[in-house]
Regions:
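His/Asp/Glu-enriched, well-ordered alpha-helical/loop segment
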Residues: 95-105, 112-135, 145-153, 157-216
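Residue-level marker of positions within ordered structural domains that often coincide
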Residues: 51, 142, 196
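Short, hydrophobic beta-strand segments that form beta-sheet elements in well-ordered domains
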Residues: 18, 136-138
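Active-site glycine- and acidic-residue-rich loops that bind
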Residues: 23-28, 138-145
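Secondary-structure capping and boundary motifs in well-ordered enzyme cores
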Residues: 85-90, 139, 143, 183
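Metal-coordinating catalytic core of metallo-dependent amide/deamination hydrolases
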Residues: 2-111, 150-157, 163, 202, ...
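Short, flexible active-site loop motifs that bind/organize anionic cofactors or intermediates
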Residues: 80, 138, 205
Length: 216
C-alpha cells in the first residue's frame, strides 16, 4: 500500500498505525510492518485488523434491536437496520483474529451490532484464550446501559464518537432514534465509570479532524 511504500522510502515523519479490513484481504498481516511487539519501522506499523459490522445511525443503516423512529423510504415500521455479514462470516472473522492474536477493531454503531460483537468475542475467548486481546468497539453510538458491564467483563475497549451529536443530534432525536435512545448516544461517562478504557475520535473525513471539538 502507499503508506508501506512511503515507509520503505523513509518519507514518514510521524508515527502511523493502520488496521487492515479483514474482508478486503490480509496481506498486511504478513508484512514486515506487523510485529507482535507493536514496534514501528520507519515510523509505520500495522496494528491489527478491522471489521465493519453495520452502518451508520444518521444513514439509518446501523443495526438496532428496536426499530428506527422514522424508517427510511421503502421500509416499514419494523425496520431496524441490518448486519453487514452473515452470522457465520462474523464468527469466522472474529475467531480468526483471536486465533492469530491480532488486535481487532469493529465498527459497531447499533446495539444489535454490539451484541453480535460481544457474543462472538466471548466464544473466541473460550476457544482461543488471548486475554490481552484489547478488541475495540468503534463508534458504539447506540450502546445500551445493560451492555456496559459485559463490555468491561470481556476486556473490550471503546472508541466513542461523541462529537457526532454536534452535527446530527437533532436528527437522531427527531427522526433516527427518538427519546430516550438519542439522549444516551455515546455513553462515555458510564463506560469510564465501569472501568472501560475509552478513546474518542473524529472519524475524519465524516466530520473535520478538530481535536478540540472531540473533547468539547
Amino acid at each position: 500500500n502507499s503508506l508501506e511504500k512511503a515507509a520503505d522510502k523513509g518519507e514518514l515523519y510521524i508515527d502511523l498505525v493502520t488496521y487492515t479490513v479483514m474482508d478486503m484481504g490480509l496481506d498486511a498481516m504478513s508484512s514486515k510492518y506487523y510485529t507482535k511487539d507493536h514496534s514501528y519501522l520507519n515510523h509505520y506499523r500495522v496494528g491489527g485488523v478491522k471489521l465493519v459490522l453495520d452502518g451508520s445511525p444518521q444513514g439509518k443503516t446501523a443495526w438496532l434491536t428496536k426499530p428506527y423512529l422514522e424508517p427510511p423510504s421503502g421500509k416499514d415500521d419494523s425496520y431496524r437496520g441490518y448486519p453487514k455479514f452473515s452470522k457465520e462470516d462474523a464468527e469466522k472473522f472474529i475467531n480468526q483474529a483471536f486465533q492469530n492474536q491480532w488486535q481487532l477493531l469493529a465498527h459497531t454503531n447499533g446495539d444489535a451490532a454490539v451484541d453480535e460483537f460481544l457474543f462472538y468475542i466471548n466464544g473466541a475467548l473460550e476457544n482461543y484464550g488471548y486475554d490481552e486481546h484489547r478488541s475495540v468497539i468503534i463508534h458504539g453510538q447506540v450502546i445500551r446501559k445493560d451492555q456496559i458491564q459485559k463490555i468491561a467483563d470481556l476486556n473490550v475497549l471503546a472508541s466513542e464518537y461523541a462529537a457526532h451529536t454536534f452535527y446530527w443530534g437533532d436528527w437522531h432525536l427527531n427522526s433516527v432514534l427518538g427519546s430516550p435512545r438519542a439522549e444516551y448516544i455515546s455513553p462515555t461517562r458510564d463506560l469510564i465509570d465501569a472501568g472501560i478504557n475509552v478513546t474518542s475520535h473524529s472519524d475524519c473525513p465524516v466530520i473535520p479532524p478538530n481535536s478540540l471539538r472531540i473533547i468539547d
